[in-house]
Amino acid sequence: EYYNEGKVRFLAPSKLVFFNPKAKLSRDFSIIVVKILSKILKEPIIICEPLAGCGIRTIRILKEVNNIKKAIIGDINPKAIEIIKHNIALNEVKEHVETYNIDANYLLLSYAISREKFHYIDIDPIGSPVPFLENAFKSLERSGILGFTATDIAPLCGTYPKTCIRRYYAKPLKSPFSKEVALRILIGFAVLTAARFELSFTPIISFFDEYYIRVFGKIDKGVRKVDKNLEKLGWITYCKKCLHREVIEGIWSKINYDCQFCNSEKDYAGPLWIGNTCEKDFCQKMLNEINESYSNNFSKAKKIIELLKGEIDYPSFYYVSHEISSYIKKPPPKLTYIIEEINKKKFSAVPTHFDPKGFKTNAPLEVILKIFRNY
């Protein structure tokens, strides 16, 4: 079974290795991130994909990004390594690649204790990235970037809260904005994991797409930077009766479980990341790169990055139109109408990538409810 993606043709037999054509967006993001990183560092870079499958992500990077000094590809499945070697030869990138048929953590740890570390690591597991983050942080160069995926959406979104607590040391929240809570729990766990090694992990671009969460973040050293990042951890509370949400800053802060608006008991999520999940400058660099080099081939990536850039500096949650219409028992207005009306009232609102009927706003809930009632 041969496929074409980007500038690469490759073999991915479904019975031997896992390959998901729907994850092209995730791989597109990796290409652009690595391309920008190579320009920022202004030196040949070393990359690693320890859970490579058929190797498509790294082979695409080698074909589509200049200035790659070396790529380390690993997989514990010997059949996968055979297919990776076939795909490397097929795409004529052999001189830049080393392949290893070993456990992902063993591969990462072998570089963590060596002088040569990675500028970019990509962790793309089936399930949770938790088992691999610690050694990934240890094997990254200072100013390096870590990209990772989580597909264990059910625990992170609150369907299996005990699993989420075991895995991420955080309580999830089943709510209309569960997807954002899931993303923020994942980032928060990465921040805390890095902090144990006096490393700061700061998200530069992160998103939720269909069945997975994707996070890219940069690392740096220094206790002050770590402590500053830890200040961006906190909690989100939610009243299911009156729909009010609240962001509580500080992992050490006390949570008031009584809703100040209706006196009902509030639910909560956390600890989680309450800072920005993307950097505006990095989003713009990605858009510039797409416009200069990729145009129509990256149309979905471009659309999502534009939405992500718009979401920056808004509260750490979103609203969904059918949630509010159900509460007031009236049909929902169109999203464009909601945003226009909020903007008229000297607040601001933007659509969110999390949900086609969702929006982020700095307007109080009372203002939103009034707009829906007057529609």
Which residues are covered by each model-predicted region?
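SAM-dependent transferase fold signal centered on methyltransferase-like domains
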Residues: E1-Y375
